[in-house]
Amino acid sequence: MRTIYLDMDGVVADWTEGVAEFIGYRLDDPTIKYPDVDWQKIRSHMRLFRHLPKMPQADEMVNLARKIRDDLGYELIFLTAIPHYNDVHWAFWDKMLWAQERYPDIPVHFGPYSEDKKKHCIAGDILVDDRPDNCQSWKEVGGVAVRVTKDYQAALDELEDLYQREQMLLSLI
């Protein structure tokens, strides 16, 4: 069975907005340099991942993924990562709870780290992710990757195109 994997942070959970609410500025602000970011303060927020807001179009993305699951026979899984060195000890549970509260029909699997996601890929599996390196490594092992950028609609359109093409192929069989 093929699988469609949805990343969480940056795809359905708005990590950037959640962190901005906590630290008082946006990490994507061009005037902020990463070495200046108070990572210790971010890591110390004990419920950061659990209380992240949804991305504005998260429900649309999830519903499209559900359509792929239901109509095309894919398995649907959240594939997320824990912070490196597991220095945010509650991230694992927070992410599980976040998904259960919002999308209880979708199981959560962990990379465990971001660069490990490709190990879950079987040729033809789909990954929807916001990190270009994850998308590239996914493609290198035979998967199909849809990258979410600031133009979220482009990712939705690309996933819809994949759905339509596969529907057309199935109709020929």
Predicted regions and their residues:
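Basic, glycine-rich
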Residues: 155-173
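Substrate-recognition "cap/lid" segment bordering the active-site pocket of phosphatases
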Residues: 81-125, 132-136
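Active-site neighborhood of HAD-like aspartate-dependent phosphohydrolases
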Residues: 1-46, 140
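General small-molecule cofactor/ligand-binding pocket signal
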Residues: 77, 109-111, 146
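Short catalytic/ligand-binding loop motif for oxyanion handling, primarily in non-cytosolic enzymes
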Residues: 13-16, 21, 72, 76, ...
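Substrate-recognition element of Asp-dependent hydrolases with the DxDx(T/V) motif
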Residues: 52-92, 99
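Acidic, Mg2+-coordinating phosphoryl-transfer loop and its flanking beta/alpha structural elements
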Residues: 126-159
